[in-house]
């Protein structure tokens, strides 16, 4: 049976030790491993002792990796597991490490959800559905997700959502109906619920002055008509142009009037 002949502190890490058996280096061990097994010089080790030492030290390596990983920011269980797997920690040890992290409150999904909620509300233009997706992707339990999504909806000021919508509106040009559609689509993509969007839309003035709309119609008409002329005859080009402009949200009568004004249609 092997005998402990030397235990020395590692030069680069004062909390790890080199374990020598029968005069030869056997392995590096964590200070907690040293204490747990009460290792000392001249100690005789059973074969089962070595297996237990190796398994425990592997677990302690996982714990130290997890603590270091969690020291930079809050993490979820899924994130910690993925990190440990990348660092070659065995699956049975990973579960023990996760249990330790929960016990010491290093992993706390409610705290994580609360922190992410506050960060997103105050620093992003995203709605509760994007928040929901993030929590789901991070492996948060469904019950916690539902609880904190509801809190997100209640705590996000409607005025903030209105500001987001107004910013989007200013970047869009075209008929009122089309601008409303684009703003709605943008808010949906940002994770806002349709009910919230409806409230926001009722608070915004989408009206544009006639001169601006007339200029936009003229610009789009020329662009669309010239494109259609390369594909169709004159009559069909006019029909296709009217259809395209109506899809853009322009009023039929205004389109006809602009066509006549441009000398394209005299009907």
Curated annotation (Swiss-Prot):
Pfam families: RecX_HTH1 (PF21982), RecX_HTH3 (PF21981). Gene3D superfamilies: Winged helix-like DNA-binding domain superfamily/Winged helix DNA-binding domain. Signal peptide: none annotated. Keywords: Cytoplasm. GO terms for biological process: regulation of DNA repair. Its main location: cytoplasm. One of its GO terms (cellular component) is cytoplasm. It is found in: Cytoplasm. HAMAP family: RecX. Modulates RecA activity. Belongs to the RecX family. This is Regulatory protein RecX. It comes from Staphylococcus epidermidis (strain ATCC 35984 / DSM 28319 / BCRC 17069 / CCUG 31568 / BM 3577 / RP62A).
